Every structure is written in C-alpha cells, then in structure tokens.
Design a protein with these regions (language model features):
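Hydrophobic pocket/interface hotspot
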Residues: 52, 64-65, 73-74, 89, ...
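Structural motif
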Residues: 70, 116-117, 147
Length: 160
C-alpha cells in the first residue's frame, strides 16, 4: 500500500503542475481549431501506444522503445527508482522481460489524456500483462512531447 500511495502522490504532483487554463481566453473559432488539433494529437498519441502494445506483445522491446525519446534526457520512474536515458531504460526492460513468457501480452487502458502545453500531453492509465508466469498490472502516467513531428514519451512513471 505504501508504494501505491507513493504512486498516486507522484501522479497528483505531476497533474497539479499541468496548466489547464490555456484555452480560457480564446475566441470560438480559435477554440474549435485548438480542439481539432487536440483530437489529432490525441489520436496520434494513442497510435504510438497501440504500436507499443503490439511490439511488446511480440517481445520486441526495441520496437516498444520506439515510443520513447531516444535520448539521455528520458526519465522513467518505477519501483526500482529513477532511470535516466533511453539505453538504460531498454536495458532494464531486457533484464526484467528476457523472454515472451515474461513479457506476455500488453494491453493499455487509457483513462485520460490532457494537454500540458502546445507540444506536450500527459496520459494516465493502466497496463495489463497477460503472461504464462503470472499476470501483472499497474498504473502509469506518461508525458508525451511532439519532437520534430513525432510524439515521443519523455517521462514515464509506472507503478505495479
């Protein structure tokens, strides 16, 4: 329970930093354009996550990691603490999920996608792993950023 409380506190802290007031003074036409763009952004983010589900479920961890920024600036926070960098995150996944039996089949349930600023969104949801070695599940909060036209995860906080 302590880990779960910690996870929810971390998620709440990140959520409280999000500025949701960025559309309050827009004209109706500007709001409609923003909403259309936001719908397109959200669809693109969900596509990245669907591609990740497929790659993970094929034990293609490199393919799964295509959804993350390939940079030392990537931050992943989970039960093992803070991991910095794309390569270290991949190495941790390979160590923890070396075979299809360990990686299993991944399913995401997205509960919310909210705009932080023009090129960033946070996504809150749940993950489910159906595995031969026993199922696993948990919650996550990830931050996507549009980098050169591609949506990439720049921060991931997952609790299982």
């Amino acid at each position: 329970f302590a880990l779960l409380r910690f996870c929810f506190k971390a998620v709440f802290s990140l959520w409280s930093c999000a500025d949701k007031s960025n559309q309050t003074n827009l004209a109706p036409q500007e709001k409609a354009q923003t909403q259309n763009t936001e719908a397109q952004d959200k669809a693109a983010i969900l596509k990245v996550m669907k591609d990740q589900e497929i790659a993970w479920s094929n034990n293609d961890l490199e393919g799964f990691m295509k959804g993350y920024i390939k940079s030392d600036s990537l931050k992943f926070y989970g039960k093992g603490g803070l991991t910095k960098g794309w390569q270290q995150t991949l190495d941790n996944y390979k160590k923890g999920y070396p075979t299809k039996q360990q990686s299993g089949t991944l399913t995401f349930t997205v509960n919310d996608i909210s705009k932080i600023e023009n090129d960033s969104y946070w996504v809150m949801g749940e993950y489910f792993l159906s595995r031969e070695v026993g199922d696993a599940n948990g919650v996550f909060m990830i931050i996507f950023k549009n980098i050169l036209g591609s949506w990439k995860i720049v921060a991931d906080m997952s609790c299982g």
